[in-house]
Regions:
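GIY-YIG nuclease catalytic motif and its immediate N-terminal context
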Residues: 1-39, 43-55, 60-70, 84-97
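A short, polar/charged loop-to-alpha-helix boundary motif
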Residues: 75-82
Length: 97
């Protein structure tokens, strides 16, 4: 087994633009998105709120889940967010405690 991994969703606002990603270091990666340190989609569309994440024992498993979820339609992703986080609260402070 390799290092742990995470699948996560960033959003611009409730029901706004969403971005799905995977990483081995969730706090670092979310910080990069929040501060606009990563050029690309999240910076362009202002996806700075961590609204959903899931931990995996292995980064490869997280990446496989990310790829599956990227093929999901938007409604399925929104349902996933709302099951864990119905108010679309920013979960940043939960991961940096």
């Amino acid at each position: 087994m390799g290092r742990p991994g995470y699948v996560y969703i960033m959003a611009s606002q409730r029901n706004g633009t969403i971005y799905l990603g995977a990483t081995s270091d969730l706090p670092k990666r979310v910080h990069e998105h929040r501060e606009g340190l990563i050029e690309g989609f999240t910076k362009k569309y202002g996806c700075k709120l961590l609204v959903w994440f899931e931990a995996y024992d292995d980064l490869q498993e997280a990446r496989a889940t990310e790829l599956r979820m990227k093929n999901w339609n938007r409604q399925w992703k929104l349902k996933r967010i709302e099951r864990m986080n119905p108010e679309w609260n920013d979960l940043w402070f939960e991961i940096v405690k």
